[in-house]
């Protein structure tokens, strides 16, 4: 204890007691304005009704608390135990941190996040707050504090926190609350008769304030109190070097439990910042560097690997694949490392466009990485509009990681997308609809971000393009109203189809049968002028999608399916990836006759799908042609002089398309395959539709690794035919070509992890790892081919009479 003339206190360095706080109560109501209006509207999201959005009574929440200093985590996160609340959200639980009072730096901050269990696999933040342990006068805070909870975000531990728990106020309520704290701590003399009136008045003002701020929530915490105040004082460093207590003159070995984490890494960087410009690795170090560079993108670099890359950074400037790894090693909050990285970055060999996508991911969101993101955009500018369209969906997602405050020119990526989209309406139309969908996602916390971007982009359009977008919006809105109205009718499907045609021909939706040219949102290359009423249809499905024939300005008909109540964002993503893979294969002169039809989500549960005509479900083909695909091809494309009596180009197309889709569905983990979502065209193309299950998910037990059904093999002439041998050869060739573009594929997936697509966002890291696992990047091309052939052989074995248990289960998969 230290004593001055007027003030007695303890030094914090003299308190060897673990720091603890008490979590008391949560007050106020959560802001639900962004929530869906009813649970029934989103009944498919079966867990949502159990979350805090739909329960006005108490809910089972839990809290995590972490200590931060200088923007870095000091301790592990401590959390409250399970507590089923019955009346109010009241914990009254003490959290004990592993650090003692004497260990706490002056800028130590408590970062608190309140969590709600959204589903068995997902948690969402109710809100977060942060609170400095020491006041500006260096005295440790104590007693009860009422902290503002910043809703729908985690507590922020940065030095300039975005979730301050205490906001300085100037009103009477704020002044009285400060006085009440002093009163509770007996820093103000008590006067019983006067205190009664004062406390009642404070209570009245508090209730009035709560009614004004009804959508704010507060957490009350209680900090430890001691007999005397605690003044911050650091431990003095020893001025001598402790010697061994033994008399022997020998080295003393000390076990450093943190050795694997390299606690001296930062100092090493400082001491070696401008060294090693001419240093070259030896054989062992070179192998280590080579192994690191072979790692997939988004792989976390260990401390040991980071030191190796940092040491030979100048040597690596000639290797364009090394730049992203080097930038991941940089501690961007450290000014010396930031300056060194930014100075060496322009000297590096320019990276590929595929690698530039990694620099736009969530790994580079620190305020000091703005130049890294700007560099990535400069690389991206090399892509033409056709190539850019293949990445546009992910680039729109990457805008959420930009430092954007409403001015597009401050963000290199946003300004680039605006510029390119303004120059090309095909690009601009897709850009607009991607922004539109993300601006209305109720499951996303980025709605306002995308709404702002959408409005800013629309304002920048010239008069012609603005009219085009307005026409698209009106067309989609009218289709949506028509679909909803038909769904509400309590009549048979046949009657609904009849009603649909009447409504389009002469009813209230007659305007949809004839209008001024509109760029079709799903394919802006096409201009449409109306719907053909007599060819309109409603498909047999729970969602009752509309089948429409659209008249084009070229006098042709273009078929689309308009869906309401169906989230097409996942299908849109998979079709985009299939289109990209088709392009990658064709660049290597391998055309596998894929059919990447077009899909566009126009709202969270609305969208348009291009129809592929003519085409027919495999189940229907087998039913009509005695279970024989060859009969189907022979009927439409006979050639008496060719094997099986079928035109050679048709068989070639069938074999190639089977190979392409087998490999792609394997890499993407497409599930729930059956004969109704495999389609055939008369000219031999096979293609897949409906991608509700991806990344290995499947409603059926033990799905086969390769989506190859018996009918496909028989359609090639059987497993011993030359066509099947060619099929296997094409599979291996396609697989290795796509493996070479693994960085591009994985980077595109990484940019989608925060897109609120459940199959990906439910487990972000695992989603990317599942694709990475299928690519088998650790294998050589020959090893990868052998692995794929083994999978094909296992699948074929399962399809034909071989008595093994697993084969039987895989055969049942296709029969289900």
UniProtKB/Swiss-Prot annotation:
GO terms for molecular function: 1-phosphatidylinositol-3-kinase activity; ATP binding. Pfam families: PI3_PI4_kinase, PI3K_C2, PI3Ka. Transmembrane segments: none annotated. The keyword Transferase applies. The keyword Secreted does not apply. GO terms for cellular component: cytoplasm; endosome; membrane; peroxisome; phagophore assembly site; phosphatidylinositol 3-kinase complex, class III, type I; phosphatidylinositol 3-kinase complex, class III, type II. SUPFAM superfamilies: ARM repeat, C2 domain (Calcium/lipid-binding domain, CaLB), Protein kinase-like (PK-like). It comes from the Eukaryota. Residues 39-186 form the C2 PI3K-type domain. Residues 669-677 are annotated as: Catalytic loop. Residues 532-800 form the PI3K/PI4K catalytic domain. Residues 688-709 are annotated as: Activation loop. Belongs to the PI3/PI4-kinase family. This is Phosphatidylinositol 3-kinase VPS34-like. The gene is pikE.
